A protein has these predicted regions:
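Short aromatic-enriched loop/helix-cap "lid" or pocket-rim segments at secondary-structure transitions
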Residues: 18-20, 206-210
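Residues at secondary-structure transition points
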Residues: 16, 21, 48, 52, ...
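N-terminal [4Fe-4S]-dependent radical SAM core
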Residues: 1-51, 63-71
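Conserved AdoMet/S-adenosylmethionine-binding subsite of the radical SAM
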Residues: 62-66, 71-74, 78-79, 83-208
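Fold-independent oxyanion-binding glycine-rich loops
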Residues: 9, 27, 40, 54, ...
Length: 210
């Protein structure tokens, strides 16, 4: 039986995670180790993880189906990195989510096969780009960003450019506003038109708020 570790299911969200009324399903674990992490509980060994089956998660998120249908809302998968759990998400959505708007928040730093598996089910992609400069990206989270770029190019080739929002943060000690603009220009050249710019404000314990 397929199971996945979750850090939370947050219902009745409006205007924060996709279209209309949305339920956020947040997964544990991530391939990155960012210096400032929005959800550090998705990484820690002592996190209060809920291990759930697709059937149990569907029972929870289906409670608000009337709101989804009335507002063109649905479900957003975040984390952590939800694309690490692509098979789980596919099984979950096949239980009955055809009329829901499905959004995924992702770093895209995952194998292409994970992206391909969920491609028929996802309407919107919110991509946490960090920075397009490979040196800045690696200094910030310890990984290369070539996989991010190649996955992004693949989505664009599939005609999804208008369904992608790229998040480009201003990260203290790692990039500048000029770096943000440079990333934006590189992404625009690829065909991306939707961006989310914000600034990290560091607080205690290497967390941040926006």
């Amino acid at each position: 039986m397929n199971r996945a570790p979750l850090i939370g299911i947050s219902r009745l969200r409006m205007g924060t995670d996709g279209h209309g009324v949305t339920t956020l399903v947040a997964f544990h674990d991530c391939p990155l180790r960012c210096k400032y992490c929005l959800n550090p509980q998705s990484l820690t060994d002592d996190a209060k993880v809920m291990v759930k089956t697709p059937e149990v998660v569907m029972q929870a998120i289906r409670k608000d189906e009337l709101y989804y249908l009335a507002t063109n809302g649905g479900v957003t998968f975040g984390g952590g990195e939800p694309l690490l759990r692509a098979e789980f998400i596919k099984e979950l959505l096949e239980l009955g989510a055809k009329q829901w708007h499905i959004t995924i928040e992702t770093s895209l730093n995952v194998p292409l096969q994970n992206l391909v598996l969920l491609f028929p089910y996802i309407h919107e992609y919110v991509v946490d780009i960090k920075d397009m400069n490979p040196c800045i990206y690696k200094a910030y989270n310890g990984r290369d960003n070539e996989l991010v770029k190649s996955n992004l190019r693949w989505l664009i080739e599939q005609g999804k450019a208008e369904n992608i929002t790229c998040r480009i943060p201003l990260i203290p000690e790692f990039n500048t506003s000029e770096d943000q603009q440079s990333s934006k220009q590189e992404l625009e050249a690829m065909g991306i038109t939707r961006f989310d710019f914000f600034k990290y404000r560091t607080i205690i314990n290497n967390q941040y708020d926006r």
